[in-house]
Amino acid sequence: MAWYDEAVFYHIYPLGLAGAPKQNYYGEPVHRLNTLLPWVNHIKEIGGSALYIGPLFESVGHGYETTDYKKLDSRLGTNEDLTAFVAYCHEQGIKVIFDGVFNHTGRDFFAFKDIQANRENSQYKDWYCNVNFWGNNEYNDGFSYDNWGGYNLLVKLNQKNPAVVDYICNVIRFWVSEFDVDGIRLDAADVLDFDFMKALRRTANEVKPDFWLMGEVIHGDYSRWVNGETLHSVTNYTLHKALYSGHNDHNYFEIAHTVRRLQNMGTLKLYNFVDNHDVERIYTKLTNKAHFAPVHVLLYTLPGVPSIYYGSEFGIEGRKEYGSDDSLRPALNIEDYKDSVKTNPCTALIAALGKVRQAVPALSYGSYDELMLTNRQFAYARDLDGTRVIVSVNNDDAPAGMHLATGNCTAYIGALSGEKVSVQDGHINITQPANSGEIWVPEGTDLNVKPVKAQSVNVENTNSINTNIEASSVDTEKATDMVVEDTQSETTKAEDTKAAAPKAETAKTASENTASETTAKESESESTPNATASDDPADPSTITMDWSKSPESMTVPELQAAVLAKLAGNGPVDAQMKKTVVDNIWHDSLVNWLKSFR
């Protein structure tokens, strides 16, 4: 057992939260990171035990086009500020992981600048993939190179070059010795070289006990990445999609099927989330805002490691607009939310869930056993050492009765509501309120959690919320009460996110709009895929497969067809599964997805 096995994560995008300018002119440091120190106390207050913060290091724009891996972004402050920040987190019992952007660098990175200056004579010409001095690009460099996602601002590192591997491993050692970081989230892990990741894992094992490596992976068999030689965990995008769509469609079968499929991959501790810096806020994604409560009960109790993205505990909105992620990464002042645990039902619920999670080991280590499943009701058990904890959720607008098998005890207590129910003939009979969830623990469990008694609601950016509500009873019901009248359909704009080829001078500005780093990552995006990644619009269902071709040599439609064929070999492929494949238009991601089938 390691600290990350029972962690509750809080995710901060620091450049956004601290209100940093979108473009970095490499001026004198501005100590914005220090303004985030009060957020550490907030994390602790809502039951968090770990912080994923990033990106942090010097870059020209959104942070994912690194200029210097060993220097805090000057828009945030100095290395001394970062050392002090991590130390303060540790004093408060909060572990810290950084964003490791090791798939690519920015164009201002020293190795790339040397290639620009010395061309064929550069000692770093093999640090990047497919540098071709007969080619050119929109920056008029006089050479071309591989990039991430079609954006030449993000220059792909040659992860098979031993010098690159050594350099990045030394970066990890530096981060530990200089900042005492506890782990790393690997950006774009689904396109990282596997031998490279194994080298990172060996370094992780060397630098610090229980040093955690978690990778950003969108699709595929997660066990290919999560194992004893590669990573400890990956992002659970599969569950992310199921959690909001399973509620929007009143279809708990989707969530249950997703959990079963993930369970079949092995005993993986995946990084669970409902939103992050790349995808729209859960409050925005939910058609019925009252589903905020059951969604988060599931997030905190299903197998895996839960994470909350900063601000979402307040119920704020965030929608992708015009291909930009700016609204997903806002500047917030913690003083505006200082009483939120008492006054905001959403925050009160998140705080209660965090404390229950930390108090009940079965939620971190217990086995998973499905107890009841309908479109609108779902219940399961987490069993550990003879103790059964039961989770029940209801996405219907009416209360629902549930008859659930129990463990060896005489009564259960609702950890969120405080309600007591007696065991009769090995079962409990409960009435789950509308649009709510509960965690049933054996009577006598030491929770140190009181039922939430929020008094009023004051949530930013949620115009549909009644901000003058008197809340008085069960926490999950209170999170429902504030929004029960708002069931309007989600109206996500399907904007064309195709980025025009940037000019040599203007491409540096903010990198811009963060679309260059993240547009492709939102696997559930409603936008129609465009020709940024592939100019071939062929329907994959019409492709005649040539299985003699390697995945790397296949076109995007061929890869899509191959993935669909592999999925079909495992069982029926429904419309949503096909959409997920067709929406993925990124060659490297599809190659890795296809390779993940065994």
Where are these regions (language model features)?
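Substrate-binding/active-site clefts of carbohydrate-active enzymes
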Residues: M1-F9, Y13-S49, L56-E178, L200-E206, ...
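Structural preference for beta-strand elements that scaffold enzyme active sites
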Residues: A7-H11, A50, K95-I97, G183-R185, ...
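Active-site clefts of carbohydrate-active enzymes
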Residues: G266-T287
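Carbohydrate-interacting/catalytic domains
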Residues: M1-Y52, E58, Y88, F314, ...
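Substrate-binding cleft of secreted/luminal carbohydrate-active enzymes
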Residues: G304-E317
